Amino acid sequence: MTDRIRPLIAGNWKMNGLKASAAEFEAMLAGAAEVTGKADLLVCPPATLLAAFAEKTRGGKAVAVGAQDCHAKASGAHTGDISAEMLADAGASAVIVGHSERRADHGESDVVVHQKAEAAWRAGLVAIVCVGETQQQRDAGLTLEILRGQLTLSLPEGSRADNLIVAYEPVWAIGTGLTPTAGDVEQIHSFIRQLLIVRFKEQGARMRILYGGSVKPSNAAELMAVANVNGALVGGASLKAADFLAIAKGC
């Protein structure tokens, strides 16, 4: 973790959660005071829960609410899609774009991710841009090449530390229980940092780089201690308040 960059623990609930899940979110709000000295907290529930969760954070609660995806357009004939403006109106402060599951399940290209990041800014949201390699790409020794291409095309000009966060998520580690070694994470996050600095100068030096991929309480402290790891994008472990807060305590 880079000391001068305040870490962010972002929970991605994916396609999980019904109205009854509000109890877990309320438990996160109740326990957030214990970790506010260590990290910022963000929870990205499914769109059906976004407004209700955002309402619970009114009055300056220590957990922000975000979204998992947005359409590039502000409105129009796009059945089933949700615009960044709608997310902001519902109370979101950030939105994940380019998650590997969106790239794989919906064929989203780097160009589409770029457009969605710009849409997030248009609505006043922070864009959390995800990048990462598959197992096949890793085995072929292509990890850094893949990341360079994704970062080059997915990150818009105008990216700043206050409007964009990069999340490195090795696809082979998501939901598998597998994680790269601390040494691997350090190498890759250092590579990402250097690319950000070359392109965005001082802003690139200050951008948060999150690690995502089977982050859990048992490995959080080790991962958060790695240089240039400025927090985590947490999947399954963010569904339980106790696990989510324990990960934040590892910062």
UniProtKB/Swiss-Prot annotation:
It is an enzyme of class 5 (isomerase). One of its GO terms (molecular function) is triose-phosphate isomerase activity. Homodimer. It catalyses: D-glyceraldehyde 3-phosphate = dihydroxyacetone phosphate. Involved in the gluconeogenesis. Catalyzes stereospecifically the conversion of dihydroxyacetone phosphate (DHAP) to D-glyceraldehyde-3-phosphate (G3P). Keywords: Cytoplasm, Gluconeogenesis, Glycolysis, Isomerase. It holds the Pfam family TIM. One of its GO terms (biological process) is gluconeogenesis. SUPFAM superfamilies: Triosephosphate isomerase (TIM). This is Triosephosphate isomerase.
